């Protein structure tokens, strides 16, 4: 017995199948060079296949052919939205292998600028996120604040983005006192005003909530299984923060809260980052209040360069300077893994030294890679426009992801 199927006037008798589209790598919401191959059933996402590696530059291999100091600028170019936090893991790993003391002032300066970097990074991410879901104005205000952060970086190191300011043994140069005063004033005036205005347009906005609430809900167990870290795992309600659980530099002296979410959706991830901006401001204020006077780099002449004045008067200082910038310092054989709380999550550096002046191996543990691999898991069953909100909430930068 044959069943007669009436031919559909719309499909002309064809069987409707899922169709496959490319999202990126030229898509403005793809945040760089991400290509996602999506399988759609109408407008419902069935499968997402992220193709990464389009920004692969062989960083880990390049580092093996450079001295420890020459390898430092490569870290600025990993997550180029938060360069100082990339350097932080690397210099801490070298210091652990060298077993050297970092002066207190240098530690305070590092923590201060790491938190300023966190604010700068969140300004970019939160601004891009609201832009992705259709709000325009808040992004402009947050870019103003990011520009302020860039100006502070420039006044400290001479460069706006790729600072290379954290060095093994401390920081490269001391900051002018006026800069610290200006940062303190900025935290009390411009930051709360502009950021508060921007968030007042977004956080209680009905359209923004419709685009983010209950999108990409991830349970606590799943967040741990997928290897989430940073705001992604804190949004799931797990108060995991390396600055508290494994404090480095002077974070153990800082008083701050760990913002956590309850619903673990895109809105919670956004909210956690918003609260983190205020917590970072709290930490910076404590640094400004507690920061002592003193040296800003290790006194070991074999690791930190002498001042220019000493170099022009002392033969010994000149020799140290010459050796340091030609041959570099030798690091005793050993291996170490150091992770720091970057704005995007846990950024780790696994450094293997063989006793020479170059790293034998430097494995970089990126933050965004583990978040991006859950893209299929988070997007399934959602609509196509939700993918941009999910990607915005992940906060992915491909310099770091592809290495």
From Swiss-Prot:
One of its GO terms (molecular function) is quinone binding. It catalyses: a quinone + NADH + 5 H(+)(in) = a quinol + NAD(+) + 4 H(+)(out). Pfam families: Complex1_49kDa (PF00346). It is a peripheral membrane protein. InterPro entries: NADH_Q_OxRdtase_suD (IPR001135), NADH_UbQ_OxRdtase_49kDa_CS (IPR014029), NDH1_su_D/H (IPR022885), NiFe-Hase_large (IPR029014). GO terms for cellular component: plasma membrane. Keywords: Cell inner membrane, Cell membrane, Membrane, NAD, Quinone, Translocase, Transport, Ubiquinone. Signal peptide: none annotated. Belongs to the complex I 49 kDa subunit family. NDH-1 shuttles electrons from NADH, via FMN and iron-sulfur (Fe-S) centers, to quinones in the respiratory chain. The immediate electron acceptor for the enzyme in this species is believed to be ubiquinone. Couples the redox reaction to proton translocation (for every two electrons transferred, four hydrogen ions are translocated across the cytoplasmic membrane), and thus conserves the redox energy in a proton gradient. NDH-1 is composed of 14 different subunits. Subunits NuoB, C, D, E, F, and G constitute the peripheral sector of the complex. This is NADH-quinone oxidoreductase subunit D. It comes from Erythrobacter litoralis (strain HTCC2594). The gene is nuoD.
